[in-house]
């Protein structure tokens, strides 16, 4: 069967369900698909189709995630759901499935639980801009006061982690009842989708952001000059644009005198394109893999930062033993490894495989860096962890 043509008429948004184990994330995902399918806006998915999540690899880490897609009146959504708690942590820290917003599922029967808190904290750390709340299992609670109490707790928790707890939409419903076709609860799912449409901001398109391209390779064309190749991460680059070479040394400005893709000359190239950029005045020795080319003054080089990291378990191919303060692995940013020293938070003696922790890092060379930049932690060429920059120090 031929693949369906991707409809670009509606703006696209990436979303995901987060929340404590057994609070109904996967049931809600199935209920959204089923409810929207009845209106011709999605393909119906059974619970077990979503629950049997395929394995994916991101930054050397295996993660189980299910992807479903659906449309609302205004948008096209790609929705990610993870079966296990560890998969969520890994997914959010590695940015395997980027989230422009999240649906936090909280069971009214339990209220906020430890993983509810952890997922909200992680969402804040990795830069998820907005959260919409679905209070699930409301059909199992007879006392309206309990529902009000749970709602209050959730709002307080969101505010604690810098989300707008007072104005966050909280929809009360039952994912299971909606999945079983109860019209009252299907309406609640539609209410949730409207809240997502209205409250979760559309992401800025990559092409609207300032230009950045990590350098993968460099070579010389006799008589023409030096060419840097790579995949454009964001923005647009045009002939005669000025760009800065940043990282692993002094920042230098060049002018683009040629843009080439698949051996064809172009006037410009944009996010997602694999290109060669001819740089006026550059010498091959000046440019190495791991540097970036970027719009002037759009990003700066740094060596010291804080990060939220996940440390792989032995079964995931990670370390067999904990690491202590002063551990010196390689940090793999974009296209290269840079050695750095890890300082652990006060009171933390060591970090055990499987832990999530906030660390302070000093790199031996500067890297073009900004908040939410993802990286892998490697030791002798194998991945032992992954993380996201949460704060730049210098």
UniProtKB/Swiss-Prot annotation:
GO terms under cellular component: cytosol
Region ranges (G2): 60-64
Nucleotide-binding keyword on record: yes
Main localization (coarse): cytoplasm
Positions of the tr-type G domain: 10-204
Gene3D superfamilies found in the cross-reference section: P-loop containing nucleotide triphosphate hydrolases (3.40.50.300), Translation factors (2.40.30.10)
Segments of this protein annotated with the region G4: 136-139
Region G1, annotated ranges: 19-26
Sites where the protein binds Mg(2+): 26
Catalytic activity of the protein: GTP + H2O = GDP + phosphate + H(+)
InterPro entries: EF-Tu_GTP-bd, EF-Tu_GTPase, EFTu-like_2, EFTU_2, G_TR_CS, P-loop_NTPase, Small_GTP-bd, T_Tr_GTP-bd_dom
Pfam families xref list: GTP_EFTU, GTP_EFTU_D2, GTP_EFTU_D3
EC number from the UniProt entry: 3.6.5.3
Entries under NCBIfam families matching the protein: EF-Tu (TIGR00485), PRK00049.1 (NF000766), PRK12735.1 (NF009372), PRK12736.1 (NF009373), small_GTP (TIGR00231)
Family in the record: Belongs to the TRAFAC class translation factor GTPase superfamily. Classic translation factor GTPase family. EF-Tu/EF-1A subfamily.
Function field: GTP hydrolase that promotes the GTP-dependent binding of aminoacyl-tRNA to the A-site of ribosomes during protein biosynthesis.
Protein's recorded name: Elongation factor Tu
């Amino acid at each position: 069967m031929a693949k369906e043509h991707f409809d670009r008429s509606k703006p696209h948004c990436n979303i995901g369900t987060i929340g404590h184990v057994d609070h109904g994330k996967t049931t809600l995902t199935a209920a959204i698909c089923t409810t929207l399918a009845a209106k011709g806006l999605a393909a119906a998915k059974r619970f077990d189709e979503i629950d049997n999540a395929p394995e994916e690899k991101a930054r050397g880490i295996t993660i189980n995630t299910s992807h479903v897609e659906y449309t609302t009146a205004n948008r096209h959504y790609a929705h990610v759901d993870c079966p296990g708690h560890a998969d969520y942590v890994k997914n959010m820290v590695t940015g395997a499935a980027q989230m422009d917003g999240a649906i936090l599922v909280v069971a009214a029967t339990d209220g906020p639980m430890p993983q509810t808190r952890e997922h909200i904290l992680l969402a804040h750390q990795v830069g998820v801009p907005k959260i919409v709340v679905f209070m699930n299992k409301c059909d199992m609670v007879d006392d309206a006061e309990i529902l009000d109490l749970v709602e209050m707790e959730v709002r307080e928790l969101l505010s604690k982690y810098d989300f707008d707890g007072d104005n966050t939409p909280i929809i009360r419903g039952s994912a299971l009842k909606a999945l079983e076709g109860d019209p009252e609860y299907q309406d609640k799912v539609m209410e949730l989708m409207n809240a997502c449409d209205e409250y979760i901001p559309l992401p800025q398109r990559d092409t609207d952001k300032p230009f950045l391209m990590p350098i993968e390779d460099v070579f010389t064309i006799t008589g023409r000059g030096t060419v840097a190749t790579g995949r454009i991460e964001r923005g647009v680059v045009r002939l005669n644009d000025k760009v800065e070479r940043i990282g692993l040394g002094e920042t230098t400005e060049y002018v683009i005198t040629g843009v080439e893709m698949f051996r064809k000359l172009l006037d410009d190239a944009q996010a997602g394109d694999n290109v060669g950029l001819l740089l006026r005045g550059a010498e091959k020795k000046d440019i190495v893999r791991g540097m970036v080319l970027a719009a002037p003054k759009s990003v700066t080089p740094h060596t010291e930062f804080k990060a939220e990291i996940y440390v792989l378990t032995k079964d995931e191919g990670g370390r067999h033993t904990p690491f202590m303060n002063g551990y010196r692995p390689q940090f793999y940013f974009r296209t290269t490894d840079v050695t750095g020293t890890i300082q652990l938070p006060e009171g933390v003696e060591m970090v055990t495989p499987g832990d999530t922790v906030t660390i302070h890092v000093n790199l031996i060379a500067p890297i073009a860096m900004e908040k939410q930049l993802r990286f892998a932690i490697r030791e002798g060429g194998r991945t032992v962890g992954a993380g996201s920059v949460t704060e730049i120090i210098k």
